[in-house]
Amino acid sequence: MRLILLGPPGAGKGTQAQRLVHHHGIVQLSTGEMLRAAVAAGTPVGLKAKDVMASGGLVPDDVVIGIISDRLDQSDAKNGFILDGFPRTVPQAEALDRLLKSKNLKLDAVVELCVNESALLQRVESRVAEMTARGEQVRADDTPEVLSKRLASYRALTEPLIHYYSERGKLLTVDGMMPIEQVTRDIYRVLEEAIGASDVQSRGKGAG
């Protein structure tokens, strides 16, 4: 099973990714972690990334794709993967498609966790109010104002990507505002319906 999990800040993406990893024996591929590992290992693409990062620049897409390519060749990725943090743009999605095609692999699905932004913001406001009432310090990056900016940034960046995968029949949407267990069940259900993953539901029953 080869998946991309999309969702804005606060959608619970990390929790759901870990559940899928645990129940299906697949790996979570975080571009940040892969970059750091490639740099530490001194691979050719890792050395390229190191030079760029040392100068304070953004790592080019072709270098990131090279690192993903190397990672997909490792034995633990043979059962499948969940990509985390990539792609973020349509050109990156196109490059990923070309990479997978070159390895005779295909992307099974892109799962988007949808959220009600105003409800998310209300949750944060309530939490901040409770912490303030208890005299606890609120982190500067854990405020409604910061979350609002992050949500707007995510929306602007991801909408073209969602359209790209929707056009290709890969996009599956799940309500990320439900309780964690319900979101997990819904992800298993849409995956089973979309790609015929008959063991998704049965293997997912132990989630929790």
Curated annotation (Swiss-Prot):
Monomer. Pfam families: ADK. AMP binds at T31, R36, G57, L58, V59, G85, F86, P87, R88, Q92, R139, R150. It comes from Nitrobacter hamburgensis (strain DSM 10229 / NCIMB 13809 / X14). Pathway: Purine metabolism; AMP biosynthesis via salvage pathway; AMP from ADP: step 1/1. NCBIfam families: adk (TIGR01351), PRK00279.1-3 (NF001381), PRK14527.1 (NF011100), PRK14531.1 (NF011104), PRK14532.1 (NF011105). Consists of three domains, a large central CORE domain and two small peripheral domains, NMPbind and LID, which undergo movements during catalysis. The LID domain closes over the site of phosphoryl transfer upon ATP binding. Assembling and dissambling the active center during each catalytic cycle provides an effective means to prevent ATP hydrolysis. Its EC number is 2.7.4.3. CDD domains: ADK. It is an enzyme of class 2 (transferase). InterPro entries: Adenyl_kin_sub (IPR006259), Adenylat/UMP-CMP_kin (IPR000850), Adenylat_kinase_CS (IPR033690), P-loop_NTPase (IPR027417). It catalyses: AMP + ATP = 2 ADP. This is Adenylate kinase. One of its GO terms (biological process) is AMP salvage. PROSITE patterns: ADENYLATE_KINASE (PS00113).
